[in-house]
Amino acid sequence: MAAAWSWRASHSTITMTSGSLVVLFLLLSIWQPAVQVEGRRQMANSQEMIKDHLGARSQNKTPAITNNANQSSTSSADLDDGAADDDDNKADLPVNVSSKPYWRNPKKMSFLQTRPSGSLLTLNCHALGNPEPNITWYRNGTVDWTRGYGSLKRNRWTLTMEDLVPGDCGNYTCKVCNSLGCIRHDTQVIVSDRVNHKPILMTGPLNLTLVVNSTGSMHCKYLSDLTSKKAWIFVPCHGMTNCSNNRSIIAEDKDQLDFVNVRMEQEGWYTCVESNSLGQSNSTAYLRVVRSLHVLEAGVASGSLHSTSFVYIFVFGGLIFIFMTTLFVFYAIRKMKHEKVLKQRIETVHQWTKKVIIFKPEGGGDSSGSMDTMIMPVVRIQKQRTTVLQNGNEPAPFNEYEFPLDSNWELPRSHLVLGATLGEGAFGRVVMAEVNNAIVAVKMVKEGHTDDDIASLVREMEVMKIIGRHINIINLLGCCSQNGPLYVIVEYAPHGNLKDFLYKNRPFGRDQDRDSSQPPPSPPAHVITEKDLIKFAHQIARGMDYLASRRCIHRDLAARNVLVSDDYVLKIADFGLARDIQSTDYYRKNTNGRLPIKWMAPESLQEKFYDSKSDVWSYGILLWEIMTYGQQPYPTIMSAEELYTYLMSGQRMEKPAKCSMNIYILMRQCWHFNADDRPPFTEIVEYMDKLLQTKEDYLDVDIANLDTPPSTSDEEEDETDNLQKWCNY
């Protein structure tokens, strides 16, 4: 070996010293015997393992390939009680023989159930016994438990939960008892958020070598929130490269592929394929079938030779690495003085930043899609560590969040000049600004915000991108997301929200609620006629019709969420907010006395269900606000329960004073208790077009001494019986 190495060294292009050759000779002399001994030991161990494996499987003579996707599971309590010793024998017991409880089919009982949110889960604990046992369900060790959201159904042996949410996660235990004993089974339930994606590979099949007539298996597990289809595809081969063109599907909807009494013709490639509506994923492994142990021994010996070659390559590479390291150290020494000066001036600062990741829906903004509602973008925030260099005493720049760059909407911060604050809430505020000599509004978060507040602002921005532009909605103009806080730039409405605008410009005679000690208000800046009010309602209907065509549900349509722009163009705002109905307290009274429940449809009050028809109900309430110059609907109702009882009884708000019957008819159509009876926004727009095109002269509205009782009188009931006749005027 030393001679061989000396010959290679003499022909090498690298000049080495005699000391290096001596060190290399010693390393090889020590390493080679160790490798040979290790190779023989691994070969012997492989032989023993294969013999033991064959001995354990020699008694199993069943068909060549079987498939089993569900492994049998028996709880520890079953084993303690002896209930799982012989399930088949117990199933054959006579009816009059006393027996403590035992599981009817323990192989179908699993210890772990993973489901996406919004799906249905059924836990089954079917047991037998004499006398007939009873069952008790526990969640996290508690017997008296309920769900915070969704229905819960307990049948004889099953527990069913619909519309799963992350709050349903936990340990569920079924305890079955009779007078002779008890058994129990635990199931861990995990509910994960839905993510639209093609199947994601979790565990793929591994290459497998089996001796003829032995047994083995391959495993394949994918994660998919959508309905998926799985299949195993087989390609026969004689060696990994000499393969047939014939492909066949040998199993479907199985996570595990079992090989029992394997034959030579079963050698080949096995591919696990799973697909859903968004695509497919696959993973492939090779099954090698050998006739005897000698083939495996030859493979082990060949592997030993490859290991020896690897040692030579490793040592040679190590010498090159040492040589390059020496050159690097020499270069570093020459630069040491310069580096020392730089270290005195530059300090490395490690910071933790948060990366904002946006999962955009595929086809979520397509109005021609088959979905009833628009798919909201998913926003995730992940922590990551970054390194920043600080020069001298100047503080290092720090950005708490890292946002993805969208070049189609990004604006330079230097073009943005912030001005006065227009309004602010608990965690966000809106500021007037100027961009390229144009007045805009900028949305941002306040100090003390949380990650959820950032995610909500990002989600609102992404929804506005998906929806697009329309004259009667607040449109997105751009954003500033790089090298600083997130600014969402939208259109500016100089006249504020519609509710305040109507109240400021209400006609004289609507001051009965004003304190007599206060001076009379100044005349309105703009005299609003009934035709102006109808134009306002028409613009809002057009904006809502556009949002409905984009599969967007507003959920909070009210005069306070409609802004008045230049030339009294109305624009619907806050349609991009992703509201969590379960976590938002819609029943709590705000400090200004407004109750958002008064704009909600009956199905939203009772079932938290929202769709375009629930927005139509809210539009009817908004229409009433317009015709009363921003008055509060249902002034005497102060709770959700009272409002729902009021609506269930068939009562509705009366027609505002001097409001035309045509407009009130539209209100009543929007307030149908059955959502299917409410007109869509497309028909509302057509109805408004007819009203505006009529030759009838509209009088200026002068609503003096207006009284809005909470119920509908009998006289108005006679008028509403002829709604269809008025609609076809």
From Swiss-Prot:
Low complexity composition-biased segments: 66-77
Parts of the chain that traverse the membrane: 310-330
Residues spanning the signal sequence: 1-36
SS bond list: 125-174, 220-272
Gene (UniProt): htl
Catalytically driven reaction(s): L-tyrosyl-[protein] + ATP = O-phospho-L-tyrosyl-[protein] + ADP + H(+)
UniProt region (Disordered), positions on chain: 56-101
Stated family: Belongs to the protein kinase superfamily. Tyr protein kinase family. Fibroblast growth factor receptor subfamily.
Membrane topology category: Single-pass type I membrane protein
Organism: Drosophila melanogaster
Record-given protein name: Fibroblast growth factor receptor homolog 1
All residue ranges annotated as the Ig-like C2-type domain in the record: 106-192, 203-279
UniProt biased composition (Acidic residues): 78-89
GO cellular component: plasma membrane; postsynapse of neuromuscular junction; receptor complex
Main function: May be required for patterning of muscle precursor cells. May be essential for generation of mesodermal and endodermal layers, invaginations of various types of cells and CNS formation.
Stored SMART domains: IG, IGc2, TyrKc
